[in-house]
Amino acid sequence: MKKRIFSSLFAICLVLLLLPLQVYAVNPIDVSRPCSLRVEYSYDQQAFPGQKIALYRVADCFADGTWELSGDFAGDPVNIHGITSQTEWRQATSTLLSYAAADQRTPFREGVTDSAGQILFENLTAGMYLIPGVLAESSDGNYQFEAFLVVLPPPAQEGDHLYDVTSKPKCSHSTPTPETRRYTLVKHWKDTGYESSRPESVTVDILNNGQVVMTQQLTRDSNWTFSWDVLDDGSIWQVVERNVPAGYTVTATREGNTFLLTNTRSGGVVKPPQTGDPMIFWPYILIMCISGCALLLLGIHRRRLVQ
């Protein structure tokens, strides 16, 4: 009877060990396998052919699902690790895009949408790619397709990775009005306890349709803000911070007519795992299983003593 109990407990322990390993197992990415990206530009069943599309490669992807900024983007003070929300993805997209535009970086690939408003990029290596926004002008107004970041292949915990991806960027329609619009630039600091590390000023380039049209200094005396008035003609405005202070990362976002530049102290930035060295869960699972079995054995032993 005693041997039977121990055999049963041992079998249960093995089952418990195997189940968590399946749940937490990392599905490796075949970084040598070619990827493709098809992008569709359409709105309310209306296709937009003849649109010039640029593709930037911003980060390398590794077999364990981590990535690292590379190429022209390698030195950008932008954190792409630990992103968990759509808001954070939009922040990373707009910030990387502002650097690409301000520095006039050369796209990795370029092309034009076909009659169906689609474009296909083939034979891409695994990595993170940036597609800038597209402004399509029409007789009934402007159609603005949002910029986006895409990881090829997208992360998958279970099953096969998807190496051929189709994306349809979000689009909004607007009618330019001949009126003056005020834009405001605001600098925000997320560095509690490190306020003394802030510089006296920061330099910001302001871009109109990808071209730098003014450079502005933001200081404490100006409350880290700047505003300008322009005629609303549907132009795309962007901002990019130059000479980001050491120890900080930056995000550039826009809400309505307000541009927000946020400097975050790097001490709180999530670092990626070492390449080829993904997080390992099985030692913790093994400890929990052994502890559970030990408690079961202890309970059985105590009941036998009582009897």
Task: Please tell me what each predicted stretch does.
Residues 2-307:
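Solvent-exposed loop/turn and edge beta-strand elements of beta-rich ligand-binding domains
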